[in-house]
Amino acid sequence: MEQFGDATTNPKGLPTALIKDVAECYAGATPSTKVAAYWDNATIPWMSSGEVHNGRVSATEKKISQAGYDSCSTKMVPANSVVIALAGQGKTRGTVAITEIELCTNQSLCCIIPNSSVMSDYLYYHLKLRYEEIRNLAGIAEGRGGLNLKLIQGIRVLVPSKVDQEEFVAFARQSDKSKFAVQNFSNLNLWGSL
């Protein structure tokens, strides 16, 4: 966020908004695992909270059937939406991902569908960089260990111009590619030394 300064103190005086003002937010649900018809021969991608660690979600480990979808309150999440883990073990809570496909989710994920003022990729990287801050919101909420929709909707985000959002996303993507290249190189060196 160096380009814009600290998101909390906003030293550059950029426009800001609460997530609830720039996006629709909702959580998913889980069909009963006791009803085989909800999970057998299923075609609807269904994302669990652990899958946020994939960063970009182009496939899900599980799928549900139309009957399973109809049996619960989960909703379809469009491609290019941001999801954030509300709960989870280890580092899961507060982790952010972006969907590359249409899918539905379990109740431990907040689905964030940005409006036209905020690019999905911008919001993804913006929230990803604020992981610790977001994760710590759970401790503020009456001593509970999880996040909730109200907390996520109340996060204030910087809303720079679309041009600045695009520049930020281009830089963040390049940084991701560089980290991936370094990791792959390290893995090659480790394997080569065996």
Where do the language-model regions lie?
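Low-complexity, Lys/Gly-biased intrinsically disordered segments
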Residues: 12-54, 70-72, 148
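Short, Lys/Arg- and Gly-enriched loop/turn segments at beta-strand edges
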Residues: 91-98
